[in-house]
Amino acid sequence: MARYRKKPVEIEAVQWTEDVSMRTLIDFTNGLVKLNDVDRDFHVYDRLHDTWVRFEYGDWIIKGVQGEFYPCRDDVFAATYEAVTD
């Protein structure tokens, strides 16, 4: 069986925590958000797949290379990504 390595690709991401303002989340997702304060549900509309994607508190919201959004748990994000310094 052949083995593959993920290409190094820079992504944009923001973590949904109490330190991040709703304005930051709205701006990052181009206003494609729904938030339910009671359940702490947060959804971002993914135009590429024409669906609402659910995020849990503490998840990273990743904007993919085609503008799609997907969630990533904090532990997985830490093991997979590192900050880009220019």
Predicted regions mapped to residue ranges:
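N-terminal non-globular leader segments, chiefly Sec-dependent signal peptides
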Residues: 1-49
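Short, compact, well-ordered microdomains
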Residues: 50-86
